[in-house]
């Protein structure tokens, strides 16, 4: 258990270091818990959140017990891309936050790529 957590933290710090070098673009940050998925577009130079989407939003929320699945990740990816376009953002840096680029994270990224570029 400890080694898995350590690997996660190492991946997270490695990714954040790479992202900090591309400071001219905003970042699309992804977080997932056991039940929900969250996505935010953050401008690190101004320290503000420009747009956000999650499975807690009324447009996505259903009566299911767990909302952390690929189907909802696609909905969140499309929703965050729509909000980014309305805010005038065309390019972002994808911050997967230490998660492996597989499954839910990949589905969210692919859905967001339909309207914004990484």
UniProtKB/Swiss-Prot annotation:
Keywords: Ribonucleoprotein, Ribosomal protein, RNA-binding, rRNA-binding
Record Gene3D superfamilies: 3.30.420.100
GO molecular function, one term: structural constituent of ribosome
Highest taxon of source: Bacteria
Pfam families: Ribosomal_L18p (PF00861)
A single GO cellular-component term on record: cytosolic large ribosomal subunit
Gene Ontology process terms (BP): translation
Subunit and partners: Part of the 50S ribosomal subunit; part of the 5S rRNA/L5/L18/L25 subcomplex. Contacts the 5S and 23S rRNAs.
Family: Belongs to the universal ribosomal protein uL18 family.
Free-text function comment from the UniProt entry: This is one of the proteins that bind and probably mediate the attachment of the 5S RNA into the large ribosomal subunit, where it forms part of the central protuberance.
Listed name of the protein: Large ribosomal subunit protein uL18
């Amino acid at each position: 258990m400890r080694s898995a957590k350590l690997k996660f933290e190492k991946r997270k710090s490695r990714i954040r270091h790479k992202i900090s070098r591309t400071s001219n673009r905003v970042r699309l940050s992804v977080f997932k818990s056991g039940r929900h998925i969250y996505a935010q577009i953050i401008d690190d130079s101004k320290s503000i959140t420009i747009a956000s989407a999650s499975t807690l939003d009324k447009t996505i929320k259903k009566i299911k017990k767990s909302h952390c699945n690929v189907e909802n990740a696609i909905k969140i990816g499309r929703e965050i891309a729509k909000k980014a376009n309305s805010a005038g953002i065309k390019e972002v840096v994808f911050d997967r936050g230490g998660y492996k680029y597989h499954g839910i994270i990949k589905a969210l990224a692919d859905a967001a790529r339909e309207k914004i570029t990484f």
